[in-house]
Amino acid sequence: MSRKKNKNSLSTFVNTILTIFGENPFKPMNYKQIAKIMSVRDAAGKDVIYQILVTLFNEGKLIEDRPYRYLLHPDFIHEYGPKPQYITGTVDMKSTGKAYVIPDEEGEDIFIAANNTGKALHGDKVKVAMFPKRKSKKNEGEIIEIIERAKTEFVGIFSLSHGFAFVVPDRQTMPLSIFIPKGKYKSSKDGQKVIVHLTDWPDNAKNPFGAIVKVLGNPGENNVEMQSILAEYDYPLDFPKAVEKEAKSISEKIPSSEIMKRHDFRDVFTVTIDPHDAKDFDDALSLQYLPNGNYEVGVHIADVSHYVQPGSAIDAEAQERGTSVYLVDRTIPMLPEKLCNNVCSLRPDEEKLAFSTVFELNENADIKNVWIGKTVIKSNRRYAYEEVQDMIEGADGDNKRELMILNDLATKLRAKRMKDGCINFHSEEVKFILDENGKPLDTYIKVQKEANMLIEDFMLLANKTIAETIAKPDSKFKDYTFVFRIHDEPNPEKLYNFIQLVSKLGYTMNISSREKLVKSYNTLFDAVDGKGEKNLVETVAIRTMAKAVYSTTNIGHYGLAFSYYTHFTSPIRRYPDLMVHRLIERYLIENQPSVDKEEYEDLCLHASEMEKRAAEM
């Protein structure tokens, strides 16, 4: 009995010592410090503690930080330390193999050393066991569970050796090569670009295993590189057969019964104004002179919702894609070509179905009346921006009087927006001139001119009006679920860094109020226009801003200074616009009850993610 009791007492003694180290994981301690914490004062007791420390060190449970001062080995911290805190989040992997986990809830990012990432990959949803926080040190932890794998297919270079092969991923956030067992090569040749699917990751393997699912071709070839970009972002190049079959069955002919249900604008002057190489015309403007001297301006948007029904194969695919993707040499559309370039596209001299917002405006561009509803239109003419810009600058052209009236009204709408506090981000885009093989020959800067802003101003007006119709406090639909385009205020830390940057360039910013900050932004943009620092200042300024996203919870749009804003005007290339069309029809025309908020919030999150992904391509 006595021996058993002594054995139990010694075991308890050892556990107590390990617990003391566990509760002080970053504090090296010797036997005297342990004895003091345990209130052991006699020499014999201290000697026992000394012997236990030596034994624990020899067993690998303690490590010697400095002579005779010990720390608990990291492998035993979770066993003997405080109960660990667990956090879930998303992995942000670095090329070095270390990572950060961005918590699902508010909080600082969590550092994960390369040897603590386990088998997690970039973008994975994971569970992290937090390490006890050390003073003045960053949050740190260990990934202990992969909740959801973000990506299982990667693009990379196939590298063949004797009897085995690897794929070296293109993506810097994938720091590991993927082992390809014999028999899983497909028809890959050494040095080719391929798509590899992760199949396994054995416990004793440093690298994941995979199988080649598609050979793309030789790196550097234009078509191969474009396919690589799409595959890397999991964006499909082709539509599923079920989608193509469904699109093929859609009739291009509009039944007279459908025309009878709609407001007829076929005899009203209507035009489209787009880039010279555009094929999908999803917006048109109409103009009528009213007897009272005012103008009726119609913003007509392709009625995609008439052709794409919820639950259809086309709708499911469009929802998954979220947006059309614009690469250097091609467009990957959200909808099949028959719809986006033909049936829905508001091409000239063709009867087309539209969803319209029609405004009565006086000569000062004050809104006197608004009508929202389904229409049938027939565009008189398709214009390129360059043609309209030439007329604005003095050239003659067809329908110049009507186009100049539209431009005058747009200019006045713009002035009102600027007065209300809109931030005037100047937009310049680098465009490439390609040869027939997709190789760049030259570049040029695409500058937004008045013709571009003419269209933009009326699209902004339509989007704002649609959102206000649903969400303003006096609307009967104010509590209904809706899709908003929201934009939060600038990040304070990024704003501070931006102010420091521009001050070194000789510019000042006033941040004492929103109004003064906006005025400072606009004054700054005017001041740098035409100067060498223009691109730097505008790029960093945009980065101070929050990213605009879709949400069912409205916070307004900071950059536009709109309390209510949505996307209604591009349903051919943006799925949220199609969602908005359906909601407007459901609420305003059919007088149906609200849809489920949680379901639509999930759709908004997905659309925002796909928009972000498309911008990165």
Regions found by a protein language model. Give the residues of each.
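Electropositive polyanion-binding surfaces
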Residues: 36, 195, 201-202, 228-235, ...
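Charge-lined substrate channels and their catalytic hotspots, especially those that engage the 3′ end
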Residues: 2-298, 305-350, 382
